[in-house]
Amino acid sequence: MPKNKKRNTPHRGGSGGGGSGAAATTAATAGGQHRNVQPFSDEDASIETMSHCSGYSDPSSFAEDGPEVLDEEGTQEDLEYKLKGLIDLTLDKSAKTRQAALEGIKNALASRMLYEFILERRMTLTDSIERCLKKGKSDEQRAAAALASVLCIQLGPGIESEEVLKTLGPVLKKIICDGTASIQARQTCATCFGVCCFIATDDITELYSTLQCLENIFTKSYLKEKDSNVICSTPNTALHISSLLAWTLLLTICPLSEVKKKLEMHVHKLPSLLSSDDVNMRIAAGESLALLFELARGMESDFFYEDMESLTQMLRALATDGNKHRAKVDKRKQRSVFRDILRAVEERDFPTETVKFGPERMYIDCWVKKRTYDTFKEILGSGMQYHLQSNEFLRNVFELGPPVMLDAATLKTMKISRFERHLYNSAAFKARTKARSKCRDKRADVGEFF
């Protein structure tokens, strides 16, 4: 059999383990076959090793079918066995192998609650994450930081997550402030630092230190306003956005005295970011302003902002933006968000959103809750619904009470099959197409009449 074809042949059984040193010289598949191999090289890792852990580096392998995956495709023991193999692979010599292992563990933890399993191995995982953050390059650092966020979400507040933050915090801070590091890695580390601090820290000094670190990053965008009326985006803009959003998240758990102090410092400077030529920066600045106004009015119902007229004019312009030089998708996204921001600033109103997960519903009725939900949704992806059902920490954050216990039979009756989803989506698509066709016909008739 040709060499390349042999490598593409799928392995039978579960994933095998791999590592460095003596462990790297022998690999075994779950089918029971053993063979001698040489230590991994970066070139081999992308082909041979990925065949062992590709199922765990693909988000869809854990997240697509939700919490019922194990009932249908394996047992808890199978998953834990495979995760042990992935944890071993985080020590591999190949950077690609380590990255794939980190991503695989992250995807598993994002789609399942594995508290007991993680609790026993938290120090091993923390050491692996620290090593990958220190010695890895851009993609590996991003994967390690993303795993650190999910690890803290699994552990929840307590001594264990405090130990994780104590170990990883200085490393994350160093990467965030390192101008020579990859922008993508710094961006993910900024989000991770904010989330881990939100979950784990009980030390007010540490909270203020994290706020200051993030503040030092995004406030660099303020400096450009002196040179021009429009803030031009730079490669660092994405980092500034992540730092601003993480800073805003942490502000929601600060004492009122610190919130008041930060309000006085930033409420007059943040509007300058609304003139950025990056749509994501404009949206992040607008949502942060709305949240700051909400916090300010929570402290003082008669909160007064001197430049209210100028601010509302700017928000109204963004809510009705018709600039032909901007992409249609960006304009549509921006107008939708800034309509809500304008209502929040002018009328103190928030359009309530409903999030459904299983038999439960959660109402997002304020900017603080929206910022919190959006942050964890970004990290957990499609696993957010499962964690809202099962993760006690998230249920406490969103005041959902203890997890609702449902037996397997009840869950099965509630689950919609893929075929039923397909039929529903097809009918909705057909109805939407007909409605839009009628609108297009009317516009065409009007054009011909005139």
Curated annotation (Swiss-Prot):
Which processes are annotated in GO (biological process)? Answer: cell differentiation
Top-level taxonomic group: Eukaryota
What keywords were assigned to this record? Developmental protein, Differentiation
Positions of region (Disordered): 1-46
Q: Biased-composition ranges for Low complexity? A: 22-32
Looking at the keywords, is Magnesium present? no
Compositional bias (Basic residues) = 1-10
- A Pfam family found in this protein is IFRD
Q: How does it assemble?
A: Interacts with PSIP1/LEDGF.
According to its UniProt entry, what is the function of this protein? Could play a role in regulating gene activity in the proliferative and/or differentiative pathways induced by NGF. May be an autocrine factor that attenuates or amplifies the initial ligand-induced signal.
What the record says about family reads: Belongs to the IFRD family.
Quote the protein name from its UniProt record.
Interferon-related developmental regulator 1
Organism of this sequence: Sus scrofa
The organism that produces this protein has a lineage beginning with: Eukaryota, Metazoa, Chordata, Craniata, Vertebrata
